[in-house]
Amino acid sequence: MVIMEGFKIAMKVIDEIDKKIKPLIGWEKADEVVKIGADGTPTKRIDVIAENMAINILEKFSGGILISEEIGLKVVGDELEYIFILDPIDGTYNALKSIPIYSTSIAVAKIKGEDKKLIRENINNIDWIKSFIANKYTINDLYVGIVKNLATGDLYYAIKGEGSFLEKDGEKIKIETKNIKDLKEASVGLFVYGLSNDLLEFLKERKVRRVRLFGSMALEMCYVVSGALDAYINVNENSRLCDIAGAYVICREGNAIVTNKNGKPLNMKLHLMERTSLIVSNKYLHKKLIALFGNRWIIKPVKFGIVVREDKEEAINLAIEICKYLKDKNIPFCVEDFLRERVGGDKFDISAISHIIAIGGDGTILRASRLVNGETIPIIAVNMGKVGFLAEFCKDEVFEIIDKVIYGEYEIEKRSKLSCKIIKDNRVIKTPSALNEMVVITKNPAKILEFDVYVNDTLVENVRADGIIVSTPTGSTAYSLSAGGPIVEPNVDCFIISPICPFKLSSRPLVISASNRIKLKLKLEKPALLVIDGSVEYEINKDDELIFEKSDSYAYFVKGQSFYNKLSRCLGIK
């Protein structure tokens, strides 16, 4: 009875806004910004009018707590029965421009009996009520959700335990997500403000059949349940509680999976300023979308692989402490053979590992990257060396980040790698990928080499030098930096070509897009070496060609301090 009463009151709000807002579409004053809303965004006149209508209905027919973008939190009516989460107009721009994709949405939770007295005792202390509601109630306490397209009249609604429904053209239809399994067949709605590299790549590579941008988050979530879309994605942490509350209930009751971009279920507090990223889809597409946009490792079982610098006792001692720490927490781990006699653990098996802890300097971290060998295994890079440009953590931070990994409270940074093919006597030799750089250098000291440098088959320069470096952005702080190359932020999609001690002063480092193909051709009858990340070597001779491209594989790091903090530390600035 209480549930149906809450639903009926919410429907009265929807109907009143629907009836009174339609005449305002096209009214020139509807577009005026009249204030800054409680959520910190500009509020249009049409939003205020819609919100005031909702307040009038709630005060007349009910009572409780209203949370809305414009007013913030308000106690309405005499009775403390319900919590209402309202978005008066979702898609305000569409409404003002007569684009028929805008909605009003509302969600309802029941105030628990024991909480009513406490709220009433503090009825004049709005800050206390905000804090109390936020600490006691979450989005999962909502049991009614309603979203109405005010332009078409399509009405989506759900009541907890009863499923989700669409009323359209006088017909009531039970709706739930479709069972499409292949991303290539999927239609996906996107929120694209603040495009990430992952999202740009997703669009560029056409990983789905079609992409749509409608501009009304609540409706787009409902479209996933009705089958008009197969997924909705917002990778930014800006989906607001009021934007999604009503649609969240409809999605939940319509068998949609709704999580943040990392696959963690939503548990948003009922507070105006709550924000989240969002992936909504059926169960078949969901893990695939998490793998594209989020931290897929959060939803994997954790087993650590320990890689440590063998000749540094301090690094070995830290590895022993880490292994003991993991044992005490009953977290499985595996170690290399030289360490197993001292700490136990399983034999090192890359196929069984979810994360690698690399303890040492940049050389150890590069070795860990080679052990990963193209697998999508994140590295926790712990600095025990002298500089540590690749390391994200110092030894004092390692136990804290291990706990964060165990509990899924961390982020991943994806780093591009460099691939190379050697064309020698009409044979093609494919080398391992490089995380830092590939260097072509004279095999005999003090002997100059000569190269033709091509970008996409266009001859860019003839270089005479001791060698030449092709570096990733990650490697820009390594050998390339010593050769006069620029420092490049790791998420820039580029490569750096840096001559080593060039004969001509005009031979300068060159930064090019990672979408290009680089070709080096050795011109002199002098033996040379291709050295990959300072360890793997190939002999190069006259007329051999080296083709460098962006690798299909990436390196993944558990994210620590910002790049610029790390840069200033490594350069001795602070």
Swiss-Prot record:
Positions that bind Mg(2+) 2: 87, 90, 243
UniProt-listed CDD domains: Arch_FBPase_1
Keyword terms: ATP-binding, Cytoplasm, Hydrolase, Kinase, Magnesium, Metal-binding, Multifunctional enzyme, NAD, NADP, Nucleotide-binding, Transferase
Protein name: Bifunctional NADP phosphatase/NAD kinase
Active-site residues, record numbering mapped to chain: 362 (proton acceptor)
Chain residue ranges for the region called NAD kinase: 302-574
Keyword flag Iron: no
Top-level taxon of origin: Archaea
